[in-house]
Amino acid sequence: VPATIPLTITNDSGG
């Protein structure tokens, strides 16, 4: 899943 949107998959910080 492309972490384009700051979710909780790869982008824990979010933004």
UniProtKB/Swiss-Prot annotation:
Belongs to the glycosyl hydrolase 64 family. The keyword Hydrolase applies. Its EC number is 3.2.1.39. This is Glucan endo-1,3-beta-glucosidase 1. It catalyses: Hydrolysis of (1->3)-beta-D-glucosidic linkages in (1->3)-beta-D-glucans. Transmembrane segments: none annotated. One of its GO terms (molecular function) is glucan endo-1,3-beta-D-glucosidase activity. Keywords: Glycosidase, Hydrolase.
